[in-house]
Amino acid sequence: MNLTFDTIAAQATPNGRGGIGIVRVSGTLTTRVAKELLGKVPIQRKAEYLTFYHQNGNIIDKGIALFFPGPNSFTGEDILELHGHGGPVVLDLLLQRIITLPGVRIARPGEFSERAFLNEKIDLAQAEAIADLIDANSAQAARAAISSLQGVFSTTINDLVEKLTSLRVDIEAKINFPEENETNVSIDKKIIANLDQAILSINKIRTAAYQGCILREGIKIVITGKPNVGKSSIINALAGHEVAIVTNIAGTTRDILREYIYLDGIPVSIIDTAGLCNVSHNEVEKIGIQRAWNEIKQADHILLVVDSSTTKLSEQDKLCNTLIANFPYKTPVTIIRNKADITGEKIGETLNNNYSVITISALSSLGIEILLKYLTKIISLPSSTEGVFLARRRHLEALEITANYLLQCKEKISFPTMLELIAEDLQLAHNALSQITGKFSSHELLKKIFSRFCLGK
C-alpha cells in the first residue's frame, strides 16, 4: 500500500529532563530535514556523531543521527532519528527547527505506528502490542506484549482465517456444483470435520486471549450486598489503607469507589458499591444503586457480602439466591460472611451450594489474608507465559462474535437447503476475525486505537 503523507516529527522520549532525548522524523521530506539540520544525509543505518544546526547557523546541539531509508524502516518511509541531550529546551528547539520546513508538521499520537500499519509493516494487533509493551505493568505483561509484537497472536488469527476461507470454498463449491453428486458425501464429511476443527481452534484462542486480556487490563472485582454489611471495610482491608468512609449508618456509600491492587503481578480493580436495598425514597441513593448494578453487569468476579451478625447460615441461601438471580449468568460469585468478630464464627473458606463462602472480619482484618490468597488463586494464570500474547476487550468481542457464527454454522450444517446461510455466516465470522488484525476495520476504529498512543510512537 503506497500512501502519500505529510512528513511528521515528534519527540520519541518522555517529557522532562534526562541524559538523552530523541526526536523522530518520518516521511518523504526526511532527507531534506537531514540536509537542513545536519548539512548531509547520514550514512544509512549507521550512527554518526553530528552537529544539529539552527536555520541561522547557530548550533542547537551535538549528538547521534540515524537514518533508515524506506521502505525498509519501521514506518515504511524514510526515518531520521536525532539523539541529543535530554533537556526540554534543547528538544523543543530541535522540533521547532524541523517544523519550520514546509510540509513538515508535529505528529499526532500514535501516527508513526499508524503509518507502519497503513504501509503494511505491521498489522493492527502488532501495532496495539507496541502501546501495550510501553504500558506493561509487570514482567509477565511485557513478555506477552513482545509475543504479540512478534506476531504470535496475529499468526494464530491468520491460521484460523485460512481455515474459514478453505471451509467457505468447500461450501461454495457444493452450492455452485450441486450436480456433482458423487463427491457430495465426501465433501459433507470434510466440511463437518473442518468446521469442528475451526470451533475447537476458536475456543482455544478465546481461552488464551482471555488470559492475555487479564495480563493487560487486569480483572474487575465488584463488592456488593445489602446496606451496612461491611463492604467498605472490606475494600479498605484489601487495599491496606482507608479508601472508603466506614460508619454504622446504612447507605454511607452512595457512589462507586475504585482501588487498584496487584495480585501475583496481575492488576486487580476492586470496586465498592452502594448497598442493594429493595426500596429507596432517596434520589441520590437510587442513583448509587443503579450505578452498583451497572458495575455488577461489567464485573469479572462478584464478592457478595453477607452480615453474619444479622443473617444466620440457614437464612443465607434465600438472601443470596434472591440477589444472585439478578446477577449476570456467567459471572462467578463468591459469598463473604463478614463480621465474624461479633458472631465468633470460624474464619476460613467453605463450600455451600457450589459457592465458595469465606468467613472474615474486615474490621479486625481477620481472614483478609485468606481472602487475598483465594482471589490470587482464582485469577492466577499458568506459571509459564511461553506463547502467551496480550489481548484487548475488543479482541475478546471479535472472538466471541466469530465463535457464535461458527456455532450457528454447526446448527445448520445438517440441512442442505441452508448452505447459502452457512456461507454467509462463515463470511461474517471471517470479517469479525479480520477486525483483530485490521484487515477489515473501520476508519473510526483505527482512529480510536491510534489516538491512545503516546507521541513519537
Swiss-Prot record:
It is an enzyme of class 3 (hydrolase). Mg(2+) binds at residues 232, 253. Keywords: Cytoplasm, GTP-binding, Hydrolase, Magnesium, Metal-binding, Nucleotide-binding, Potassium, tRNA processing. K(+) binds at residues 228, 247, 249, 252. One of its GO terms (molecular function) is GTP binding. Its EC number is 3.6.-.-. It is found in: Cytoplasm. GTP binds at residues 228-233, 247-253, 272-275, 338-341. (6S)-5-formyl-5,6,7,8-tetrahydrofolate binds at residues 24, 81, 121, 457. Its cofactor is K(+). Pfam families: MMR_HSR1 (PF01926), MnmE_helical (PF12631), TrmE_N (PF10396). Binds 1 potassium ion per subunit. Residues 218-380 form the TrmE-type G domain. One of its GO terms (cellular component) is cytosol. HAMAP family: GTPase_MnmE (MF_00379). Homodimer. Heterotetramer of two MnmE and two MnmG subunits. This is tRNA modification GTPase MnmE. It comes from Baumannia cicadellinicola subsp. Homalodisca coagulata. The gene is mnmE.
